[in-house]
A protein has these predicted regions:
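Bacterial N-terminal signal peptides
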Residues: 7-17
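Boundary at the C-terminal end of the N-terminal hydrophobic targeting segment
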Residues: 18-22
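Short, non-transmembrane alpha-helical segments in secretory-pathway proteins
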Residues: 26-48, 91-112
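N-terminal, post-signal-peptide region of Sec/Tat-exported proteins
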Residues: 46-82
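Conserved histidines in hydrophobic membrane contexts and catalytic metal-binding motifs
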Residues: 61-65, 123-126, 130-132
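A short, surface-exposed beta-strand/turn
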Residues: 70-84, 132-145
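Residue-level detector of conserved, function-critical positions
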Residues: 115-116
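Disordered, low-complexity segments in secreted/periplasmic proteins that are enriched in proline
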Residues: 145-153
Length: 153
């Protein structure tokens, strides 16, 4: 009986959490203009399956899912934050900084970039073999941030 009640409580908490943290569905036309332009330019043949807005840590954020399986996240002003390619494809090459594209081509022959995220000080990229790289815009390894939350000096 205790296990049953504990399981039920866990299910209720999970359900409430999923509802609280889920984004609010919106129409594609409600995205910031920059995000709409990005979709038109880099995903011209793909159809939008779902668009959600969410109040993130840095303000309003938007998530777009495409029918191909690709995904794109945008900041409140419509700049891309993260792009994930559809299975078996790579992210649009035009959004990858040239130095990073050259670095990957030279050091990871045969691999493609399947996901790219903008991070403070650079980019995080995931390659088709599962490798993850954290690089500055000029393809240098990103240094760990100093003095972050929970760290003591």
């Amino acid at each position: 009986m205790k296990k049953f009640l504990a399981t039920m409580l866990l299910m209720v908490v999970a359900s409430v959490s999923a509802t609280i943290f889920a984004g609010t569905p919106i129409k594609q036309s409600e995205l910031p203009k920059a995000a709409q332009s990005f979709i038109t330019k880099y995903f011209p043949k793909d159809q939008v399956r779902k668009v959600e807005k969410d109040n993130g840590r840095r303000g309003m954020e938007y998530e777009v899912d495409f029918t191909s399986g690709a995904e794109a996240d945008f900041t409140s002003d419509g700049n891309w934050k993260k792009v994930k390619a559809a299975h078996g494809t790579s992210v649009p090459s035009a959004i990858v900084p040239t130095a990073i594209a050259k670095y990957v081509a030279t050091n990871f022959k045969g691999q493609t970039i399947v996901e790219i995220s903008r991070k403070r000080g650079g980019y995080e990229v995931e390659l088709s073999n599962g490798s993850e790289l954290k690089l500055t815009e000029d393809a240098k390894p990103m240094q760990p941030r100093q003095g972050g939350r929970g760290q003591r000096r």
